[in-house]
């Protein structure tokens, strides 16, 4: 949640000086995906999209015996009331606020200059509806900030159910009855784990489940390393180095034209001539649609990113009573707002040129080391069928980047990541990576003892820089050596 807030602050900085010229909307896979489903513009708050994936055939002579899983918590409520701070900003322009001030014993003339100016600009009918929708979303979230929603609980129950369905051999082996599950101490991560395990108990009732949090280091020494990697000191955090994405953002955001939103959400209550959205000076009368000129200049473009940031929490709730906020934006506007966030995610968490890759080194390496060690123990013959880890996007993204999996493997300037490293395909709510281990059932000459395939959000993926043994299956020794090399490099 802290990193999400940091991204939000970066977004606001990037939007302070947006140019107002419109460019042609770029083509590309991310744009096409958002066009297909606008809610994907929510980035890390986009809800999990289960896929009815057709898995590759299991290689002859092999059978799955062990699963290593690392997942983000499911859909959650907004982190705090600060996620709805834009409501206070919009209230300055709301007719309900002006009516309240008239009823007040305080002389309206004594109000601040800011309040007086806001009365010259008010919310349109659509703007008032938007404000009502935001208030409704905030009220729906109060008392539940940061908690897992029922939608998030379903996401993890369904992932658990599909895991048991796809790999019944793993959860029916009498010699491997143990399942070890661990989460961070966050309530939403714990609740995600509990929902996953409740479904597992229905589908594989004879498994012996050990459930831990990161506090339980006496019972499970790797509890912290498995869920959040190596701890970062305050000094390390202070000295993290990230490339400046503001120039790239400024170029991208030329396509974001706030005039339509200004005209949609605000009106000017004056006799001034206001620049119309078609760019011509037009006397529009006493009440005019608002565009970026005259009184409209008092409204900063950052208010629109605040609206989108607050409104996108609706998808995590999944209740029909909660309004859909995408109706206020065009797909183009959603796309451009999304590009800023995904660039910041890449610059901070992945193998971005100019970064020191601190999060890959601390978070990613610690988790990946645990994955390797626990897999080797399972291969050596312990009784564990699955290691399940429940954590956060802050740790999942660096892990995926360090592993070099398809869709998170790009190394280069941030601007090149737009269609290569897409946040809603990597760290959506309940996002996960699973390593499925297959053991050779009989002696076969020149065949690896253990094969592994990698799933990202339950879809088979490759590591572009490492050749598989066959299809999407890797020789575990090759994959392990590759991971160890990546840890050493980063």
Regions found by a protein language model. Give the residues of each.
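Signature for phosphate-centric chemistry
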Residues: 23-180, 184-387, 391-490
């Amino acid at each position: 949640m802290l990193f999400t807030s940091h991204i939000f602050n970066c977004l606001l900085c990037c939007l302070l000086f947006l140019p107002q010229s419109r460019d042609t909307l770029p083509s590309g896979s991310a744009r096409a995906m958002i066009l297909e489903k606008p809610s994907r513009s929510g980035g890390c708050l986009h809800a999990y999209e289960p896929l009815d994936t057709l898995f590759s055939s299991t290689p002859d002579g092999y059978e799955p015996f062990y699963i290593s899983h690392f997942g983000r918590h499911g859909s959650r409520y907004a982190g705090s009331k600060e996620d709805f701070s834009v409501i206070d900003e919009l209230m300055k322009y709301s007719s309900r606020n002006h009516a309240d001030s008239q009823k007040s014993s305080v002389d309206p003339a004594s109000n601040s200059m800011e309040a007086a100016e806001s009365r010259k600009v008010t919310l349109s009918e659509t703007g008032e509806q938007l404000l009502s929708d935001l208030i409704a979303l905030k009220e729906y979230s109060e008392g539940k900030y940061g908690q897992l929603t029922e939608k998030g609980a379903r996401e993890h129950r369904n992932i658990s159910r599909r895991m048991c369905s796809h790999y019944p051999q793993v959860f029916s082996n009498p010699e491997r009855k143990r399942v070890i599950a661990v989460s961070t101490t966050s309530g939403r991560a714990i609740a995600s784990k509990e929902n996953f395990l409740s479904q597992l108990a229905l589908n594989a009732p004879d498994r012996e489940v050990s459930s831990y949090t990161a506090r339980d280091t006496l019972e499970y020494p790797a509890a912290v390393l498995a869920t959040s990697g190596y701890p970062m000191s305050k000094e390390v955090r202070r000295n993290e180095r990230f490339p400046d994405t503001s120039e790239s953002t400024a170029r991208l955001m030329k396509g974001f034209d706030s005039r339509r939103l200004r005209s949609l959400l605000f009106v000017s209550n004056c006799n001034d001539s206001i620049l119309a959205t078609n760019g011509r000076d037009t006397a529009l009368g006493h009440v005019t649609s608002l565009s970026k000129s005259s009184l409209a200049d008092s409204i900063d473009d950052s208010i629109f990113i605040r609206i989108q940031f607050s409104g996108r929490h609706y998808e995590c709730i999944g209740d029909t009573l909660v309004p859909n906020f995408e109706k206020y934006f065009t797909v183009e506007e959603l796309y451009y707002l999304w590009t800023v966030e995904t660039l910041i995610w890449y610059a901070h968490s992945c193998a971005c040129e100019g970064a020191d890759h601190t999060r890959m080194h601390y978070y990613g390496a610690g988790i990946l080391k645990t994955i390797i060690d626990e897999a080797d123990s399972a291969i050596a013959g312990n009784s564990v069928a699955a290691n399940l880890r429940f954590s956060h996007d802050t740790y999942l993204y660096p892990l995926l980047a360090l592993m070099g999996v398809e869709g998170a493997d790009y190394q280069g300037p941030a601007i090149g990541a737009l269609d290569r490293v897409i946040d809603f395909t990597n760290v959506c709510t309940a996002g996960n990576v699973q390593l499925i281990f297959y053991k050779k059932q009989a002696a076969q000459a020149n065949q690896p003892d253990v094969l592994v395939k990698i799933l990202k959000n339950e879809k088979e993926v490759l590591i572009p820089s490492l050749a598989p043994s066959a299809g999407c299956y890797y020789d575990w020794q090759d994959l392990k050596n590759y991971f160890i090399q990546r840890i050493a490099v980063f």
